[in-house]
Amino acid sequence: MASEGAKRQPETQNGAAVGLAQVAESLECPGTEECLVPAHETCRSPGEDKCPVGHSLEPELQEEGIKVGEEGLNAGVEAGEERGPKPTSSIVRPAHGPKRKSEVELPPGVLQKKEEPEGSHSESSLSSKQHKKAKKRKSGGAPVPPAVASASAPAAETLGLEPFALPWVLAGKAQRLRPLYQYINYCNPELNQEEDGDREPEVEPEAELALVPEEPGVEQLQLQTLLPVAGELGLGLALPCPNPLVPLTHNLPPLVEEVGEEPGGLSSLRVSGSLKAEVDKTTQVDIDKMLSVCAAPLVPPLSPQYK
């Protein structure tokens, strides 16, 4: 190999010397038309001896130079192979970090042993997490604390009821709040309906009206007992009222009767009858007013009014 390279080197040197000689001839050539003629035309001329050799040798020199370069590369590769094969080490990228380097250096058996404890550790961590979640779910449905349960049990025993009857009792209490306002809600008497056990004896308004006329009769009797005193005092004097609560309208009929008895009996009876009717009407009006005031809603009803 070395001898072949030494032989080819003088050939290349000879080619380079011929090329330089041609360049020098071209520079020495005077400015004539013969110098401007291309190389292939000069070769076709009858004077073939004058044909420049440099142009014809250029492609051969180029081919030889390419062959020499290829052979030099092949020789370098062969020399590298003769020196010895390079150790094939596993190329590790720096992005993977030191852990991957250590894994590459370790044999596969050790790697499998390492992977097994890691997998078991991950499984144990997952099972512990699931256990904690299950505990949280159980604690989420918070049962009734024992203190509250024990407090509700004695309450049921003191009432003499079974434990399941407590909601019914509470509902009954909520329903019994309504009859407290039965005397206020007069616009809708349908809402005041009660059960048979909760009803209380109510006094009918007709019975009250029937009792009302008796009160003026008692007052009239009291006034009649005082009539002789009024006669002694005289007709012009006013009769003192024994009871301040008694209205003055009740004092008029006896006086009118006495006045009417003096002139004549018939006229006095007519006047007294008309006055009694007027007095009864006025008393009835007063009674109606009192009843209307008593029946008025003192407090606005809390229950909704459906009209």
UniProtKB/Swiss-Prot annotation:
Compositional bias segments (type: Basic and acidic residues): 42-52, 112-121
Region spans: Disordered: 42-153
Protein name: Uncharacterized protein C16orf86 homolog
Biased composition (Basic residues): 129-139
Alphabetical list of PANTHER family matching this protein: CHROMOSOME 16 OPEN READING FRAME 86
Database matches in Pfam families: DUF4691
Source taxon at top rank: Eukaryota
